[in-house]
Design a protein with these regions (language model features):
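Short acidic low-complexity segments
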Residues: 27-38
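Active-site oxyanion/phosphate-handling segment shared across diverse enzymes
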Residues: 118-142
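Cysteine-nucleophile active-site neighborhood
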Residues: 48-119
Length: 142
């Protein structure tokens, strides 16, 4: 299997590569169109603000490649947010538009934002895609 980690310019690529290697797959970190198009799986990592990430993706010519991808694509952290239409962060920025949703700041008085750490998973989605995503995860698992 050819797994590609997109070189977004705004992510901890070594940490993700290590995690993928633990699954028995040697990932390729790249921004090359041919590598991305020939991948079996694509990882879209991200750290920082949506605006900075979209600027970095655009400078690397990645938005259209990501939008055209037909392979399974996993957005991690900010990478998942980038799949939406628009983020209200830093005054608003257009995103990749692969998911019909806007990214909005959580209204969580008294809770630290951003939240980092481990939480138990309690899926509440009934769509076929969500059921597939959570197929082997029981409610309450880490």
């Amino acid at each position: 299997m050819k797994a590609v980690i997109l070189d977004t310019g705004c992510a901890n690529l070594a940490s993700l590569a290590f995690a993928v290697k633990r699954l028995g797959v040697e990932p390729l970190i790249t921004r090359e169109a041919a590598d991305i198009r020939s991948a079996d799986r694509i990882f879209l990592p991200g750290v920082g603000t949506a605006k900075a990430a979209m600027t970095a993706l655009t400078e690397r010519g990645l938005p259209e490649l990501i939008r055209e991808a037909h392979q399974p694509l996993l957005g991690i952290c900010l990478g998942e947010q980038l799949l939406g239409r628009r983020s209200e962060e830093t005054g608003g920025v257009d995103l990749l538009g692969l998911i019909d949703a806007d990214v909005r700041q959580l209204n969580a008085p008294g809770l630290p934002l951003p939240h980092m750490g481990w939480n138990r998973v309690f899926p509440k989605f009934e769509s076929p895609q969500a059921k597939l995503l959570f197929k082997n995860i029981e409610p309450g698992e880490w």
